[in-house]
Amino acid sequence: GKEKMPKYWLPWLVGMPAETSLAICSMIFGGVFEKFKNLKVCFSHGGGSFPFTIGRIEHGFNVRPDLVAIDNKVNPRDYLGKFYLDSLVHDDMALKYLVDLVGDERIVLGSDYPFPLGEHEPGKLIESLSSLSAESREKLLWKNAAEFLGIKQSI
């Protein structure tokens, strides 16, 4: 199917989210997070398709451990909230789902700047999400990124 990808800008629309999910699954199934317990990683594009296909991924892990759980016996769902994701999902319902799925502690502001699919007003989606508390908004807009980078926050 590679020959179909350039048409309709598909590498950017569906390829990148798929590649991000592939990277997450490869790190989980390869045991990277088990081997490097203190590893801090942030995946762009809200984790790509990974958060939205976690049910399918977990089901595959459970029904075909002979193919999936070869190098790591930990359920992939157990990793939700253990690595960071950015907020660049371009959809209020998707961002709400992401927060509900992984919590507000591991999502950081994503802009994708300077690329054409970047958020034109970084943070606007976060600020517009009425289901987020003021505290959660602050976490997503800057506090989580400061924590990820090891920047001390003074009060």
Where are these regions (language model features)?
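Mid-to-C-terminal alpha-helical segments outside catalytic/metal-binding sites
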Residues: 39, 48-49, 72, 84-85, ...
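Histidine/acidic residue-rich metal-binding segments in metalloenzymes
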Residues: 1-78, 93-105
